[in-house]
A protein has these predicted regions:
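Residues at alpha-helix caps and immediate loop-helix transition turns in enzyme cores, especially N-
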Residues: 39-41, 67, 98
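Structural micro-motif
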Residues: 75-88
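Thiol-based oxidoreductase modules, predominantly thioredoxin-like and allied folds used
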Residues: 29-30, 53-70
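Non-catalytic, surface beta->alpha helical segment in thiol-disulfide oxidoreductase systems
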Residues: 86-118
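A short acidic, amphipathic alpha-helical/loop segment
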Residues: 43, 70-71
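N-terminal leader/targeting and pre-domain segments
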Residues: 1-24, 114-118
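Local sequence-structure signature of Cys/Sec-based thiol-disulfide redox active-site neighborhoods
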Residues: 15-50
């Protein structure tokens, strides 16, 4: 299954709660409509593709602001877009936004928080 086939799109606060409850180890990518979103996702896509066991949710912020706000509410991490959050044991362990979403930063966080995971 490809990464794009594995993506769960979250549109409501209830979907955020259900996703995080079902997947204590997961990634959430908040996508805006600017070029930063597509460029940052393209940079980290191979890393996420290689972690086939890591559930990935995407929130299209313009269309699903309440879902994005729910992530900020439950994590205490202010909303940004684009933004990548990694969760371990149901808690956020990594947060990067905008141009700080790099292959180097994300790769290191994946290796640190999910060693040996694919």
């Amino acid at each position: 299954m490809t990464l794009k086939e594995r993506i769960t799109f979250l549109t409501t606060p209830e979907e955020v709660d259900a996703f995080l409850s079902a997947h204590p180890r997961a990634a959430i990518f908040k996508a805006g409509t600017c070029h930063k979103t597509s460029e940052t996702f393209r940079e980290i896509e191979p890393l996420l593709e290689a972690r086939s066991g890591l559930p990935l949710a995407v929130i299209r912020v313009v269309e699903a602001r309440p879902a994005s706000n729910r992530v900020a509410e439950v994590t205490g991490i202010p909303h940004e877009s684009p933004q990548l959050l990694l969760f371990k044991e149901g808690r956020p362990v990594f947060d990067r936004d905008n141009w700080d979403i790099t292959a180097e930063a994300v790769g290191g966080a994946l290796d640190e928080n999910y060693p040996g995971s694919s």
